[in-house]
């Protein structure tokens, strides 16, 4: 793991708007920070057919995701558009303090990062803040587990966070047994030491070997 970065791992980035989250991360997301959103977990149809409209300042996607950061007084909020020249995409990443991986599909996110030559670039980033939602949070991990039709699959991620393995969108009433199975599988198949269930109203802050729970997080 790159211990020089700080990682905020969420199930739902809307939690950033919650007072509980704000109190937990306000000393990390500092005023005048510059944020770049990498939306590559979205469907290809959305990315390649609607991005010009949705990612502009007046677009619904832009407004929805910028809203998460408004109370932190960030100075700039960019979204990487797949139609951007690669040099401009890399400039946005280099120029910003915060890399925000929005949610969607893990495999699409990995495919797009590799297709645009960003997989290795992101792995080399140091001294930045990563905020990752759902699919983004899973892909940051060394390894992650997903369930499809109640069948578990282990997948490889970016290997930027190698001490936690998270179960996203956890609902205590619905997922208690599944999380128990998840923990057993994680202990057997993944190298991460700590396993957490993160609800839509919770998140983890990972700084080196220090893990801080914010909101509704279970272990």
Residue spans of the language-model regions?
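Active-site-adjacent pocket-lining segments in enzyme domains
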Residues: 110-129, 136-219
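Extended, subdomain-level signal for the structured scaffold at the beginning of enzyme domains
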Residues: 1-94, 98-107, 192-197, 201-219
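Short His-Asn-centered micro-motif
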Residues: 101-103, 112, 133
């Amino acid at each position: 793991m790159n211990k020089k970065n700080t990682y905020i791992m969420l199930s739902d980035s809307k939690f950033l708007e919650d007072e509980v989250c704000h109190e937990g991360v306000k000393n990390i997301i500092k005023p005048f920070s510059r944020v770049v959103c990498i939306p590559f977990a979205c469907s290809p149809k959305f990315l390649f057919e609607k991005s010009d409209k949705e990612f502009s300042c007046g677009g619904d996607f832009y407004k929805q995701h910028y809203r998460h950061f408004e109370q932190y007084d960030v100075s700039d909020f960019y979204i990487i558009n797949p139609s951007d020249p690669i040099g401009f995409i890399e400039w946005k990443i280099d120029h910003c303090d915060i890399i925000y991986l929005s949610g969607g599909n893990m495999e699409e996110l990995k495919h797009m990062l590799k297709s645009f030559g960003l997989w290795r670039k992101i792995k080399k980033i140091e001294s930045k803040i990563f905020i990752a939602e759902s699919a983004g949070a899973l892909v940051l991990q060394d390894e992650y587990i997903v369930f499809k039709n109640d069948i578990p699959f282990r997948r490889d991620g970016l290997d930027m966070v190698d001490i936690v393995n998270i179960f996203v969108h956890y609902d205590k009433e619905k997922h208690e047994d599944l999380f128990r199975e998840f923990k057993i599988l994680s202990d057997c198949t993944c190298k991460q030491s700590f396993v957490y269930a993160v609800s839509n109203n919770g998140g983890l802050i990972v700084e080196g070997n220090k893990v801080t729970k914010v909101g509704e997080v279970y272990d």
